Amino acid sequence: MLQQRSLKTLTRAVGVGLHSGQRVELTLRPAQPDTGIVFRRVDLPQPVDIPVRAEAVTDTRLASTIAQGSAKVHTVEHLMSACAGLGIDNLHVDITAEEVPILDGSSASFVFLLQSAGIVRQNAPKRFIRVTRPVQVREGEGADAKWAQLAPYHGYKLSFEIGFDHPAVDATGQRVEFDLGRGNYRRDIARARTFGFTRDVELMRANGLALGGGLDNAIVMDDYKVLNSDGLRYDDEFVKHKILDAMGDLHLLGKPLLAAYSAFRSGHALNNRLLRALLAQRDAWEVVTFEDERQAPGGFAQPAQAW
């Protein structure tokens, strides 16, 4: 039986929120089978649980935000991406502020935290949402067009194309494909950092955003070049970060996907629209388990090795 996964023990991290600049403490704790991933705002007078699901997403401007009533958690996508890449099904996430810490701007620190705590198999079948026919969402026309699609695939594959007209981005790949069954999330995707432009950062800070951002947790560019002294971690780091974000956004479905995801200039908003469109078309998906691990797609049978 292909089993669900959680942590062996708890682990903690301290950092700042990318947009709020607030200090935040994060505690990742084991959870029982079939719990799912549940965020808990422990800083509130009465702690509030926010279970991960597509419908819990309430804001997608600059990041993915989930909420339960008035309690919110912003910028969940990098932690969720690490959970997707490592196959984590059940997890308690205790947080002392309204934004997940940005750490180094990628998901690598979250991967390290999760693997340091130990990943264990649980005595319950891992449940997938398997896409049975294509579902697509689109936005804009012509040069402004954006789209994202899920199609049937025996595994989990993501293909993303960006369209940034910038010398530093043009010099790298603007399209990448990652197959969880053939690649290695930790090696190929996890270290890709979020990125932004100085002109946008100045505007965001004037509006009380990006207060925790800087060269130590993002790729920053002026109109011509990358400003980080250490350059890029991957030749195609920009588009690989979009794959990282997409994996996090799609893991907000609450169950791992068996599908081929493809997108052109998509973002948090379109990714969430895609999940909602999928769920609304009940004939486009089914829940499946694998009693025989040998029948499971590649990339899901064995937990990733520790660093």
UniProtKB/Swiss-Prot annotation:
Organism of origin: Verminephrobacter eiseniae (strain EF01-2)
Origin: domain of life:
Bacteria
Keyword Hydrolase listed: yes
A Pfam match: LpxC
Q: What is this protein called?
A: UDP-3-O-acyl-N-acetylglucosamine deacetylase
**Keyword Glycoprotein on entry:** no
As its record notes, the protein acts as a catalyst of: a UDP-3-O-[(3R)-3-hydroxyacyl]-N-acetyl-alpha-D-glucosamine + H2O = a UDP-3-O-[(3R)-3-hydroxyacyl]-alpha-D-glucosamine + acetate
EC?
3.5.1.108
